[in-house]
């Protein structure tokens, strides 16, 4: 393969990768918004001193 052919193949790979990655970025933005909404609901709920994280579970009751 000549240098021109290798450069052309390189450009095709870069352009294909760029075009394929754009739709997946826009799809993940919608999922991120939904996840943020769910997370805000968790923070608004009353915990009453409960912690469900394994590191602090021995000090606080999880309530599950």
From Swiss-Prot:
Cystine bridges: 51-56, 52-62
Gene Ontology MF annotations: acetylcholine receptor inhibitor activity; toxin activity
Entry keyword annotation includes Transcription regulation: no
Propeptide, residue positions: 22-49
Cysteine amide modification, residue list: 62
Entries under PROSITE patterns matching the protein: ALPHA_CONOTOXIN (PS60014)
Expression (tissue specificity): Expressed by the venom duct.
Keywords from the UniProt entry: Amidation, Disulfide bond, Secreted, Signal, Toxin
GO cellular component, one term: extracellular region
One Pfam family of this chain: Toxin_8
Localization terms from the record: Secreted
Keyword Nucleus annotated: no
Further information: Found in injectable (milked) (IV) venom.
Recorded family membership: Belongs to the conotoxin A superfamily.
Name by which UniProt lists this protein: Alpha-conotoxin CnIL
Organism field: Conus consors
